[in-house]
Amino acid sequence: MSGASDIPSFRWTQSLRRGLSHYTTQTKGDVLRDAKSLVDGLDFSQVSQVQRVMRKERRSDDDLLKLRDLNKAVDGLMMMRNKQSNVSLKVGGLSKDELMELATDLEKLKRKINTNERSTPGVYQGNLTTAQLDRRSAILRSLGFQSRQGQNNGVVRIWDIKDQKQLINQFGSMPALTIACMSVQGAEQMNDVVQGLTTLGLLYTVKYPNLDDLEKLSAEHTCLQFITREESANNISGYNLSLAAAVKAGACLVDGGNMLETIYVKPDVFADIIKSLLRVKHQERMFVSEKPGMRNPYENILYKICLSGEGWPYIGSRSQITGRAWDNTTIDFSKDVMYGPPPPVKNGGNIRLNPLTDTQEAVIKEAISKLNPDETIWVDIEGPPTDPVELALYQPTTGYYIHCFRLPHDEKGFKNGSKYSHGILLRDIENARSGLLSRILIKLPSKLVLTCQGSDDIKKLMELNGRPDISTIDLSFPTDQARFYESVVWEKFGSLCTKHNGVVLSRKKKGGNSGEPHCALLDCLMFQAAFEGNVPSIEPKPLLPSALVFKSESVVAM
């Protein structure tokens, strides 16, 4: 609950409470109404079964089905349910800088959570038997590694299931459920449970309650004795009576504490909440840490708010929500954003800002739709990102590629680039379709990830064309490795591009041909060959007709 040890976690929590106080609500009445509904309507024999499941060292698909069925029953009995209300944020309610910051933080959070789920208990990671796990624990103890309290002597609890996605949103505690379980399974009066949890909640206004605090408070409130002494961990179900679950329940019972747990999110105030959250983040210099481990307070609230878009992010039932925070809250830069520098307006009247026809736009859209965003897509350009003259996108798994040219604005710089790099002659691209390169970039899918050899120019190109949402994977091969297959690629695929006809000189030696020119398309093929260790075997196939790429080669009317 407290997050990472190297940050002022509770101070961050207090600052978030103050900064988001306008969005907190009084939840005690709603929580108690749902708790009574669960007491009356829930089959607690099923609750006991699920609690036994969560104590097992290895859990199966049948165990997961029991958990999901019970979660569905709980959701049906509760009023405090989170609704699936996916949000797409655009420039307007939030500034472009705020949207960029939010997108970056969600991406970092995605990497952190995915790393945790791959490397920590709770997700199936192998086939160790119980005997092997016990033996491993004994080895660790013999080497002086003491097991922490609540970790069951190192026994790892894993989900041995077919579809790990079925685990998403099936965990996390709900105050109404915690109160109901403590009342029924502990044979306690609900009023006594409320009093004990309220005491924990009041303590939570000044510090994170710990196990020592729990021990002392249990002497006064016997109902607190039912709270487990295990430390909090990932994939703890709402049916585990953990300290974190009890503290969360207590927070909801304290009226006037501006507790984060009582925040209620509605679609019409979603952007305002995010804006306030980012403001507090800057004041306290909060951040998303990509180190594996529990979420810090900023990471926790960011994930919870962005998960459903409507409801109680901390305390409402969310088991019927699909997707993760980064799936359900997306950043859309495709509208209300000026893409690249505006074209000059000539004296005397109207000009078409987009030089392409609607039919040509449709051809581009269809071509891009054939690139699978979940598979590797190479990108390369020739010329500087501020004045590119060639663009190529290539997908190795299908052989599909998009390849186009553009007339330069800076002819002097272009000639220098031709002389020492790409070898393109101006006369060979004088009929290149105006506006095609930028429209291809604009129509690429949102948040696409492109693979490249050297990312600085690609990133700048995307930013200049209004596509900062597109990210890159830079393989950063050494030059010799990157161009190892150069001659083989040119020999096999050189006929794909006939626009590099100039002599290319070496910058290192005075005079003399430096070898093959740099072609954006063939470089993509060459980099893929360097990555795979052999030349691509799938025949490259163009997605754009030459009649669109070059005006003079028109065969059919576009």
UniProtKB/Swiss-Prot annotation:
Pfam families: Arena_ncap_C, Arena_nucleocap. Mn(2+) binds at residues 380, 382, 523. GO terms for cellular component: helical viral capsid; host cell cytoplasm; ribonucleoprotein complex; viral nucleocapsid. It is found in: Virion; Host cytoplasm. GO terms for molecular function: hydrolase activity; metal ion binding; RNA binding. InterPro entries: Nucleocapsid_arenaviridae (IPR000229), Nucleocapsid_C_arenaviridae (IPR035084), Nucleocapsid_C_sf (IPR038115), Nucleocapsid_N_arenaviridae (IPR035083). Residues 54-236 are annotated as: Binding site for the cap structure m7GTP. Zn(2+) binds at residues 390, 497, 500, 519. Its EC number is 3.1.13.-. Keywords: Capsid protein, Helical capsid protein, Host cytoplasm, Host-virus interaction, Hydrolase, Inhibition of host IKBKE by virus, Inhibition of host innate immune response by virus, Inhibition of host RLR pathway by virus, Interferon antiviral system evasion, Manganese, Metal-binding, Ribonucleoprotein, RNA-binding, Viral immunoevasion, Viral nucleoprotein, Virion, Zinc. The keyword Zinc applies. It is an enzyme of class 3 (hydrolase). GO terms for biological process: negative stranded viral RNA replication; RNA-templated viral transcription; symbiont-mediated suppression of host cytoplasmic pattern recognition receptor signaling pathway via inhibition of IKBKE activity. The record marks 457 as: Important for exonuclease activity. Belongs to the arenaviridae nucleocapsid protein family. Homomultimerizes to form the nucleocapsid. Binds to viral genomic RNA. Interacts with glycoprotein G2. Interacts with protein Z; this interaction probably directs the encapsidated genome to budding sites. Interacts with protein L; this interaction does not interfere with Z-L interaction. Interacts with host IKBKE (via Protein kinase domain); the interaction inhibits IKBKE kinase activity. The N-terminal region is important for the cap-binding activity while the C-terminal region contains the 3'-5' exoribonuclease activity. A CCHE zinc binding site is present in the C-terminal region and may thus contribute to the substrate binding and/or the specificity of the exonuclease activity. Encapsidates the genome, protecting it from nucleases. The encapsidated genomic RNA is termed the nucleocapsid (NC). Serves as template for viral transcription and replication. The increased presence of protein N in host cell does not seem to trigger the switch from transcription to replication as observed in other negative strain RNA viruses. This is Nucleoprotein. The gene is N.
